[in-house]
Swiss-Prot record:
Annotated motif DEAD box, positions: 432-435
Enzyme class: hydrolase
Organism placement in taxonomy: Eukaryota, Metazoa, Chordata, Craniata, Vertebrata
GO MF term (any one): mRNA binding
Gene designation per UniProt: ddx4
Region (Disordered): 1-241
Record's protein name: Probable ATP-dependent RNA helicase DDX4
Subcellular location: Cytoplasm; Nucleus
Motif (Q motif): 274-302
Species, as recorded: Xenopus laevis
Tissues with expression: An mRNA and protein component of germ plasm and primordial germ cells (PGCs). Doesn't appear to localize to the mitochondrial cloud of early oocytes. In contrast to its germ plasm localization, shows weak expression in the animal hemispheres of stage 1-5 embryos. Expressed in spermatogonia, spermatocytes and, to a lower extent, spermatids of the adult testis but not adult sperm. Expressed in oogonia and oocytes of the adult ovary. Somatically expressed in animal cells at the cleavage stages and in ecto- and mesodermal cells from the gastrula stage onwards.
Keywords: ATP-binding, Cytoplasm, Developmental protein, Differentiation, Helicase, Hydrolase, Meiosis, Nucleotide-binding, Nucleus, Oogenesis, Repeat, RNA-mediated gene silencing, Spermatogenesis
DNA repair listed as a keyword: no
Reactions accelerated catalytically: ATP + H2O = ADP + phosphate + H(+)
Length: 700
């Protein structure tokens, strides 16, 4: 169901900043932050656990002064937990529960039980059911369960990892949205990812660590249920020239860009330019370029800027971190400033001259900030629109005037269909990360956009596509949206990895990855590191585990709330967290300064994804390194294209990887046998739980 842009929604701002940062002092609570409203609106006694793995375990009680002690301890099973109450009274039993609460459980295992006065505590160890006065078991949730007072079944704002149980009419939880994942222990008929109607996450709405977003299958199955209202309003973008024009320092290899070969395919190619002066930018734009620290053109800029200024359609392929965003923003802004185009304020229907589309919220916001930087002090007004923020807030920003609309695909279609944005004046259509925009992930949205009323035909608009990778089938598909005489610029090799990144591939068994990861991080604790995994649950598990091991960590993926995603990136950019664990949502386009190391904890399934991941380091002439944990059993499909990427980038190719890539089935069988023997002899190595592969949801 689409969001209602026309209804005012009362703003509900988050009261804390979520992160996984490590303990600074012994008495610091790092996993939760309370406001006065939190204290007044919650039940103080709650337990949470992560089923079989021990996981996080948080226990809270309410001492008279509301102060909470902080203590970290190991939970049972494989995992970790926090105990937030050190003040057990004499009335409490061995599990730390008093007679009033009637909750019983095993730490790290879940399993709570409510019973009448005088009964002994009981718990269904490991299965976390609850018991009422009739001794009936309900809710065999493997992840915690819930309690009953006086025989009443409810979730009572607890946010427990409970299941919906065996009864169809079991009430849903509200306020703290607990886990209810069919993959992680759901036994009820109404399984799904998150029984709560609000935020969900590791611990619930006003707490910090999150594994799921609380997206319930109930919400999708019940047609009459209203979608959750989005109330988040992002903070305003940085103000003041010092913040707007913060410079990204180029590295020692920046001048080597001139050595990269450039190939331009097409007829009547405009000549390349060598300096910004040759671009004939207006004075204000030239001054903003200088303030931003741009001194020398990169190869993709030298060729793309004159092509766009000549009015030609363009498909450009250049390595990660080589200045593609400026390559299309500068000629677009130059045209608008030369034509004297200004924003028309407070019109119900805004008709931008340029629309820029990117696959992720973080990337499109980054492009918007660049457009805002280059257009500073002019009458050109860029606006950004993406999912996860309050619709009314976004619409008010659009109504103030919009010349350049930066948007994610789904939100763009929504705002166009509601006739808030018109397309009749569109001159430039830009697809950043074009291969991702045209694959099966976003192809239907792009096709819908092209057929919207008012969309100029490809003959009457200028279409620009940029990416670091272009599979052959995507290049064929792109021709449907480009003029027949479009140009194709290739800087270096199509789909090639950045040559400034030192790549290492390690053969690893699954149960040895965590130990190796800790070894790498301990040997370079001050390095800013991005760790990539293939599932959202694993991202949060690893981030939490690293936090327990005293590494300042956070995570970002499609199931986290938007303010959590923005906060995680901010913590990583500013150095508050030196490690961020990511899924594919952070693999493309993000330009984070001083990322020194990228670790592929899970090797991606496609080699193009590998190129984008390792491209988070080694940007703008800086050097970086990438380490990949290659599990032969899971990753052999990517072996041959990975060897080509390493060879083309002049990196060392391990002999075992070449054998897998070109040795046929016999080589694979021998590796499988060795891997199987290694698994049996693995001992007590720290093992990451196996999580089912899931699609990265909510990119938009």
């Amino acid at each position: 169901m689409e969001e209602n842009w026309d209804t005012e929604i009362e703003t509900e701002k988050p009261t804390y900043v979520p992160n996984f940062s490590t303990l600074e002092t012994e008495n610091t609570d790092n996993y939760s932050a309370y406001s006065n409203n939190d204290i007044n609106n919650q039940n103080y006694d709650s337990e949470r656990s992560f089923g079989n793995r021990g996981g996080y375990r948080s226990e809270r009680s309410r001492p008279s002064n509301f102060n909470r002690g902080s203590r970290t301890e190991r939970g049972r099973g494989r995992g970790f937990g926090t105990n937030r109450n050190d003040n057990y009274s004499s009335e409490r039993d061995v599990f730390g529960d008093d007679e009033r609460d009637q909750r019983r459980g095993f730490p790290g295992r879940g399993g709570y039980n409510g019973n009448e006065d005088g009964q002994k505590p009981n718990a269904f160890r490991g299965r976390g059911g609850f018991r009422n006065e009739n001794e009936q078991r309900r809710g065999f949730g493997e992840r915690g369960g819930f309690r009953s007072e006086n025989g009443q079944r409810n979730f009572d704002n607890r946010g427990d990892f409970g299941n919906s149980g065996e009864e169809e009419d079991r009430p849903r939880s509200y306020g703290r949205g607990g886990f209810n994942n069919s993959d992680t222990g759901g036994r009820g008929r109404r399984g799904g990812r998150g029984g709560g109607s609000q935020y969900g996450g590791y611990k619930g709405r006003n707490e910090e660590v999150g594994v799921e977003s609380g997206k319930s299958q109930e919400e999708g199955n019940e047609k009459d249920e209203k979608p959750k209202k989005v109330t988040y309003i992002p903070p305003p973008p940085p103000d003041g020239e010092d913040n707007i024009f913060r410079q990204y320092q180029s590295g020692i290899n920046f001048d080597k860009y001139d050595e990269i070969l450039v190939d331009v395919t097409g007829k009547d190619v405009p000549p390349a330019i060598l300096t910004f002066e040759e671009a004939n930018l207006c004075e204000t734009l030239r001054r903003n370029v200088a303030r931003a620290g741009y001194v020398k053109l990169t190869p993709v800029q030298k060729h793309s800027i004159p092509i766009i200024m000549a009015g030609r359609d363009l498909m450009a392929c250049a390595q990660t971190g080589s200045g593609k965003t400026a390559a299309f923003l500068l000629p677009i802004l130059s045209y608008m400033m030369n034509e004297g185009i200004t924003a028309s304020q407070y019109l119900q229907l805004q008709e931008p001259e340029a629309i820029i589309i990117a696959p992720t919220r973080e990337l499109i916001n980054q492009i918007y900030l660049d457009a805002r930087k280059f257009s500073y002090g002019t009458c050109v007004r860029p606006v950004v629109v993406y999912g996860g923020i309050q619709p009314v807030h976004a619409m008010r920003d659009v109504e103030k005037g919009c010349n350049i609309l930066c948007a994610t695909p789904g939100r763009l279609l929504d705002i166009v269909s509601k006739e808030k944005i018109g397309l009749s004046k569109l001159r430039y259509l830009v697809l950043d990360e074009a291969d991702r925009m045209l694959d099966m992930g976003f192809a239907p949205e792009i096709e819908k956009l092209m057929t919207k009323p008012g969309m100029p035909t490809k003959e009457k608009r200028q279409t620009l596509m940029f990416s670091a990778t272009y599979p052959e089938e995507i290049r064929r598909l792109a021709s449907n949206y480009l003029k027949s005489e479009h140009l194709f610029v290739v800087v270096g090799l199509v789909g090639g990895a950045c040559s400034d990144v030192a790549q290492t591939v390690l053969e690893m068994r699954e149960n040895g990855k965590m130990e190796k990861l800790l070894e790498i991080l301990k040997s370079s604790e001050k390095e800013r590191t991005m760790i990539f995994v293939n599932t959202k649950k694993k991202a949060d598990f690893i981030a939490g585990y690293l936090c327990q091991e005293k590494f300042s960590s956070t995570s970002i993926h499609g199931d986290r709330e938007q303010y959590q995603r923005e906060s995680a990136l901010w913590d990583f950019r500013t150095g508050k967290c030196t490690v961020i664990v990511c899924t594919a949502v952070a693999a493309r386009g993000l330009d984070i300064e001083n990322v020194q190391h990228v670790i592929n904890y899970d090797v991606p399934k496609e080699v193009d994804e590998y190129v984008h991941r390792i491209g988070r380091t080694g940007r703008c002439g800086n050097t970086g390194k990438a380490t990949s944990f290659f599990n032969v059993q899971d990753d052999h499909v990517i072996a041959r294209p990975l060897v080509k990427i390493l060879t083309d980038a002049h990196q060392e190719v391990p002999a075992w990887l070449e054998e897998i890539a070109f040795g046929g089935h016999g080589a694979l069988n021998s590796f499988y046998a060795a891997d199987s023997m290694g698994e049996q002899a693995g001992g007590n190595a720290v093992t990451t739980p196996s999580f089912a592969q899931e699609e990265e949801a909510s990119w938009d």
